Amino acid sequence: LQPLRASLRAGDLAVQKSTYQTWLTQSLPVYQEKLWNGQYFRLDSDSGSQVVMADQLCGQFYARLLGLPDIVPSDRALSALQTVYHACFVKFCNGEFGAANGVRPDGSPENPNATHPLEVWTGINFGLAAFLVQMGMQDEALKLTGAVVQQIYHNGLQFRTPEAITASGTFRASTYLRAMAIWAIYLVIDAKKHILHSDTNTV
């Protein structure tokens, strides 16, 4: 949905804007109806999976970052973020590693033999942390970031930051660029400081 919003902002042809606006208008209510379960957004509409996906609202983060309208209501975004924080981070290995890509609400794996759902992707975690800051959860963001950074540095990976680390002590995809998302945390914190400074001067 967020790419549609961005396309509407960037599009310079009336036909394109009309098409994208139609798609967006049709999609927004369906997204809520099919995926919202009262606490977080489901992985999909048909499988019945209970998995809490760590980056389920990355589009909402980018929309706010770009100054675009929200994709989902802010109260639902906050509820989903709190669920992600507790399920994927706090309850997953007691918060030692960072947020797993996708686990049940109690932090347990849906499939213990799965690979990607139980990995902690450094870049996804930093993006999630930036979103937490954006939504007023800075303490939680710094705890999450700290856990991931500690895993990287304590395991001697600071000059070969991996894409993924696991609770079993393995890692893969060294020097993966998505970890540069850590700068998004600074970007959001800095933006909040500028807003606060501007408000103070206005008063």
PLM ranges: what are they?
Residues 30-54:
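Short, surface-exposed recognition loops and adjoining beta-strand edges that mediate ligand/DNA contacts
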Residues 2-7, 11, 45-202:
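Active-site core of glycosidic bond-cleaving carbohydrate-active enzymes
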Residues 1-37, 70-72:
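Active-site neighborhood of glycoside hydrolase catalytic domains
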